[in-house]
Amino acid sequence: MFGGDVSAASVLPSHPISGSCDGFQAEGSDHHHSTMTPFQESQRNVYQILYGHPANDDFPRPITPLQITIPEGDASPTVPVSCGVVNGKMHLNLFMCPGIHQPCIEVGNDLLSPKQFTIRGDKERQKDWKASIRVGRSSLRTHMEAMTIDFYEHMNRCSGKCQSRNYVNAPSEEVLQARKSKRTSEAGQLKYEIENEMAGKEADNDDNRKSAKKARGRPRGSVNKPRQMVKMEPQDDRFFEEFFIDAPPLQSMSSNEEPTSSNKESNECTPFNDILNCLQNDPMNFWSQMQQTGVIGHFCDDIIVSAINLKQSVMDNPVTPTTANMLTRTAFALGIPPVVVHRVQSIERNAYQQRKHDEMFNDIQSTLAEEHSVKYQPRTSSSSQESLHTAREFTEEKVEELIDVCKYDDYPESECLPGPSHIQ
């Protein structure tokens, strides 16, 4: 990029590199050390800075050597950057916080901002503009996270808009160790919870426990909420001991008779009739125990699923006396009879209003039809009658004229006035 061999070595210049190079971290940094190999090119000093990484560094990615050009005078030092197929030089003293809209990249005779530089390199669709700009084989974000490149005088000129990724205020070693220990404790707690959950279901199956998949880690910042474990008393063999208070005594068995399978099951759990008896006769006791053990939500889900199935059955099939009684009992059990009554009244009101609306619409249609018939039919009949009357009067007048002429008696020719033929 610079037209010279970077590996060529020469004598170090006498002036230090700390005066005008505030945009990058030079030697003497607490976290990174560097070895510099300068060479001469077109009366400018170009240094290849190699940054090492300590053992406890939080950035394990390798960073390519950073080539910084130190011009003579007060000009800004530059580093070669690229974006796609476009190459340029970033002026470190012009790279100010937050950087995205600061003209600091020289491309030919233009001074572009990083945003304009990514647009020219056809990388504007990427959300992370720092990752789109390359400094050698590493991205600009990698160098900024490693503190090899920073905004110019960032401590004094920070705009407060650069904290989105929090790479400027790098966490200290104590904070990193606390985060690692927290993640380790969270992973251990999650593993302990999974083992406790699996212990109740697969206690007698060690092979399944070994072949179980490991749980994936949760995102940073998430908190593992403690699960509601079932409160089982280890010294009590029976889970719900209150179920046995009103239970009838078991039938006596002969000493020679071996216990049946039902008796074996009764030792493991409460008999079916005892639980059903408690559910029907002592619901307060039953549901209190369900709430205390943390399993009452499962029964509520079962009730909801049963209600959905009942709804689907009623909508798809004709109503039977069984389903009708079930719906009525459910409505009264849930305390919604007033809601049902109000809903029926609302449906009736809507039907009545619709019926009145239809009647009003029909009346309007009939009225308009009558007005239309009255408006056009009388005019046609009156005009025809007037025409007929006029024709009759005209005929009568003609007939009268003819009759009057015919009534005259014949006069002798001597009494008649001479006509036009006699005029000389």
UniProtKB/Swiss-Prot annotation:
Role: Transcription factor which controls spermatogenesis and sperm cell fate by regulation of sperm gene expression.
Alphabetical UniProt keywords: Chromosome, DNA-binding, Metal-binding, Nucleus, Transcription, Transcription regulation, Zinc
Protein name per Swiss-Prot or TrEMBL: Transcription regulator spe-44
Gene of this entry: spe-44
Bias (Basic and acidic residues) ranges: 192-210
Principal place of residence: nucleus
One Pfam family cited in the UniProt record for this chain: SAND
Database matches in SMART domains: SAND
